[in-house]
Each structure stands twice: as structure tokens, then as C-alpha cells.
Amino acid sequence: RLRSRGLGDVYKRQMYTVIKRMEVSAAHSLKLSYRSKCENLHGHNWIITVYCRSKELNADGMVVDFSHIKQVVKEQLDHHNLNEVLSFNPTAENIARWICDQIPTCFKVEVQESESNIAVYEED
């Protein structure tokens, strides 16, 4: 309910959030300071969840077009060896931050490489 505050005050505090979830199949090997089977090339069916927010909508009435998020993530990562397309050690944490950096309205990314392993990057 709107009380004694004017509509302008209410809209100033509102935030739009969109969430895009997609699956990406990709391979990688990790460069680690300790021995691990993850140093060998292996793959995941990653579940990537991208969170975007904005106080205002763009000219098309969106925070960001869902297809833009999909394009950025899928074209760069899907069915690739991540060591060949990314310039950093492709840990789930690093991938989450990289995705967040690619999308201007993004503030949080979850990278799930298995049922029990999820990395989250979130900006303040």
C-alpha cells in the first residue's frame, strides 16, 4: 500500500531484477598449486545463473534482454575448452566473475559445476 509518501518516493527505492539460468557444456583443466585430478582435462554441464538489476528500465522496458545474457555466455563458453578461450585459470569462481564483468547490469553470478559444487561471485 502507498501511504502518505508520494509515488516518486516509492519508485526511488524500487529495483528491477532479472535472473537468467542456462546450461553450458564445456571442458577445462585447472592449474593448481597442489596435485589434483582437476589438473586433467575434464568437462561439466555447468548451470550458470546470472542476476542483473537496475533502478530503471531501458528504452525497451527491460533491465537487459535475456537473449543478450545468453549470447554473451553461450557463444564464449558453450562446447569449448575454456583454457583455450579464457585468459585465466578457469575455476568456477573466476568464471563467475568473468561473466559478471561481461554484462553491465549484472551483480551476481552462480556457476554450478555439479550437484554439490557451486561458486558465487557477487558485487557489493
Each model region followed by its residue ranges:
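Single conserved hydrophobic/aromatic residue that forms the stacking wall/gate
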Residues: 1-14
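Charge-rich, low-complexity N-terminal segments
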Residues: 13-124
